[in-house]
Amino acid sequence: MAGYSIIHVSDVPDVSGDYPGAIRMATEHIGAEQVALTYRRMAPKTGGKGSYGHRHRTQEETLYLISGTVEVKLEDEVIEVGAGTIVRIAPATLRSVWNEGPEDAEMIIVSHRLVDQSNEVETVDGFWPE
C-alpha cells in the first residue's frame, strides 16, 4: 500500500440526507489513521440555530471556513467569521454553527480520529433558541 491517498471530495458520500447542503466525512475514504476530516457545505439559513449544540469528551475541533460567512456560537458567545478564518474549539466547549448569509458556506472540520465515538458527543437541546 502506498504511503499516501488522493481522493476528490465529490467521491465521498454525502451523509446529510434530506438536510440542505452537504456533509462529507472523508476520514475513512482517504484511509486516515490519525486525523478526522469532514467537508461541510451549508446552504443559507441552515445549521444549528434553533436546535441543539454539542461538545466532545476528547476531540478538539478546528474549523476552516473556505467560503461564505457563518455564525459560530461558542458557549454564550456568537462570533461571525468569514472565508479564510480558522477557529479552534476545545473539546468541552459547547458549539454550533449557523449560515445566516445569502449564499452557501463551505468549511473543513479537522480533529483527531476516533475508532469508537459512542460516548464522544454530548448534545444540548435549545442551545441556540431562535
Where are these regions (language model features)?
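A short beta-loop-beta micro-motif enriched in histidine and acidic residues
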Residues: 27-36, 47-61
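Short acidic-glycine-tyrosine-enriched beta hairpin
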Residues: 76-91
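Short beta-strand His + acidic residue motifs that chelate non-heme Fe in jelly-roll/DSBH
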Residues: 72-73, 89, 95-101
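Short, charged/polar surface micro-motifs in flexible loops or helix N-caps
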Residues: 33-35, 43-48, 69, 113-117
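Structural motif
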Residues: 62, 69-71, 78, 94, ...
